[in-house]
Design a protein with these regions (language model features):
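Positively charged, low-complexity/disordered segments
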Residues: 200-202, 207
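Aromatic-lined carbohydrate-binding surfaces of glycoside hydrolases
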Residues: 1-195, 199
Length: 207
């Protein structure tokens, strides 16, 4: 999905593959913490991942499970800044010794354009099933930490999902959530997963 999306935003095939980590680190990339480490990813591996992804989705549906697909919250290649110098892109600090990643500001017009392209490319490959994961500023700080800004972030991401898929459900992890983002989204459109709540409660009271 990322490979096809980046080709739509002036990346060459080599640049798009160079953004992707090696298979052993892809989980961290989907958590927005790293890019490129262990890459570039061969096109043959990308193609095999598509085949595997389709098999996983088919099995989930066969078992009556609800797939949760990747959404878009602004994580982008660092190299996007050079290609779109007018866009509001912030560079994050190093994470566990890895070079920091880049964040496209949700208030920038390019955010909606790129997010919609990402969801479209995902739909072409796998279809869409109405539930999308997105964790804005996961394990990092927003460029502007005010209630007004974070409210706008929540509204923008919600609008993106609803534009692509009316009635979409946004799924967010509890450990990196921010209250103003949460409150900006209608309750029926947001599901918060508290993945480690039993051992490490993240919030004692409802918001």
């Amino acid at each position: 999905v990322w490979y096809n999306t980046l080709l739509r935003f002036n990346f060459t095939e080599e640049e798009a593959r160079a953004f992707l980590t090696g298979p052993g680190h892809s989980a961290w990339q989907w958590m927005q913490n790293i890019q490129s480490y262990g890459g570039p990813l061969p096109k043959s591996v990308i193609d095999k991942h598509v085949i595997l992804g389709k098999k996983i989705l088919a099995r989930q549906l066969e078992l009556g499970m609800q797939p949760i697909q990747q959404g878009f919250s602004g994580y982008v290649p660092r190299e996007l800044q050079a290609k779109y110098p007018q866009a509001k892109i912030s560079m994050k600090r190093k994470w566990c010794g890895f070079d920091g990643t880049a964040q496209l500001d949700p208030t920038d017009p390019l955010f909606h354009e790129m997010g919609l392209a990402f969801l479209e490319e995902q739909d072409k490959l796998f279809g869409s099933y109405g539930v999308y994961a997105a964790d804005p500023f996961h394990e990092s700080a927003p460029p502007i930490d005010t209630p007004e800004y974070l409210t706008g972030v929540g509204q923008t991401i919600h609008k993106l999902f609803q534009t692509f898929d009316a009635g979409a459900l946004w799924v967010m992890q509890a450990w990196s959530m921010r209250e103003d983002i949460v409150k900006a989204v209608p309750k029926e459109s947001l599901l918060i997963l508290s993945l480690i709540h039993i051992s490490e409660p993240t919030r004692p009271e409802p918001i």
